Amino acid sequence: KTGKVGTFGGVQLPTVTIFMDGFADGVARYNKDKGANVQLIGWDKASQKGLFAETFEDKAKGTQIAEQLIQQGADVIMPVAGPVGLGAAAAAKNHAGTKIVGVDSDWYQSAPEYKDIVLTSVQKGIARAVYDTIKAGADGKFDKKPYVGTLKNGGVSLAPFHDFEGSLPAGLTGELDAIKKEIVEGKTVVTSKSAFDAKGGSGK
């Protein structure tokens, strides 16, 4: 609603910044499709510079950074910082209208104390990754290439909107499904300097 969203990381590592790159791409796609001008605070994909707590453990740091983002006008925050992200959720809960986008797992379920402010979550499909790896071994197809989770193989996904389903703009879920289809079919190519391809190389 404010026209500003925010993100921050725990430590500047590829496994963190790849989430932040994706969030930046999502904002850019929304602006393009909707003719909007939503501003992302806390991360610049082009320069790879942004906000970091420099810890994955100190929840107070998460609260501090989230407060900073909120004061700058962000009303949706995606903390990519492990337990530090829960500190951000605590800050968001104290500001009416501020929402959190969880990471790694569905925070609506894994952090139920904050479910009333969890808009959605970007999930890692750990169970699917384990299944695929074991199956590859059983089929004699296991190799040393790193497992890369994608929308196509179920290694990553967007969690349900849960309690916010009824208040979403009309047609939004259909638009998201269409974008997912574009990515899976290769019509929309998603890149990140933090990514690794299936051959073990670095991303673009």
What are these regions (language model features)?
Residues 1-204:
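A residue-level marker of the well-folded mature domains of exported/periplasmic proteins
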